[in-house]
């Protein structure tokens, strides 16, 4: 189970990814942002948050829309 702080991190990452996508940022810029988020929290968070962040990364790689419902 994710803590409230971890949910905030995930929600903020998803919002930023969707914003970058709306602004037509390059896929590799978005991937760099997600990778930096993963690096920042990697040693200090639950496995569930890491799994969700890697799922976000995978959706960016595949070019799919990142859904807000992922956090549930």
Give residue ranges: language-model regions.
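Residue-level detector of intrinsically disordered terminal segments
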Residues: 1, 69-71
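N-terminal acidic leader/helix
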Residues: 1-32
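Short, charge-rich amphipathic interface segments used for partner binding and complex assembly
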Residues: 28-69
